[in-house]
């Protein structure tokens, strides 16, 4: 949690420092499934509103969005991609 907070704050600082030439955002992913112990995956999934861990593709979409011109007016934002885990 501390490292995610540091990355988010760094992105915010860089966004103000490098604007308007460069947009800087960050992504805070939740748990990504990588063949973890089934008991861990089940416990994690029970605590997530979308009832599963992320896949790499779940993270890739937001990365592509932030890298594209579709997000041309977004800077200094930390996009949480955690299936709702953090809303509890």
Predicted regions span which residues?
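A short hydrophobic alpha-helix cap/turn motif
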Residues: 16-20, 32, 54, 67
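Active-site segment of SDR-like NAD(P)-dependent oxidoreductases
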Residues: 14, 85
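C-terminal helical subdomain
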Residues: 8, 26, 45-70, 74, ...
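A glycine/serine/threonine-rich, flexible loop-to-helix segment
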Residues: 26-48, 58, 88
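Short, small/polar-rich loop/turn modules that mediate ligand/substrate recognition or access, typified
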Residues: 19-23, 74-76
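Active-site helix of classical SDR
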Residues: 3, 11
């Amino acid at each position: 949690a501390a490292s995610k907070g540091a990355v988010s704050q760094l992105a915010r600082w860089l966004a103000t420092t490098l604007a308007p030439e460069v947009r800087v955002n960050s992504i805070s992913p939740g748990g990504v499934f990588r063949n973890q112990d089934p008991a861990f995956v089940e416990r994690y999934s029970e605590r997530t509103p979308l009832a599963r861990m992320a896949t790499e593709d779940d993270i890739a979409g937001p990365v592509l969005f932030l890298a594209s011109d579709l997000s041309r007016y977004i800077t200094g934002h930390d996009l949480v991609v955690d299936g709702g885990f953090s809303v509890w």
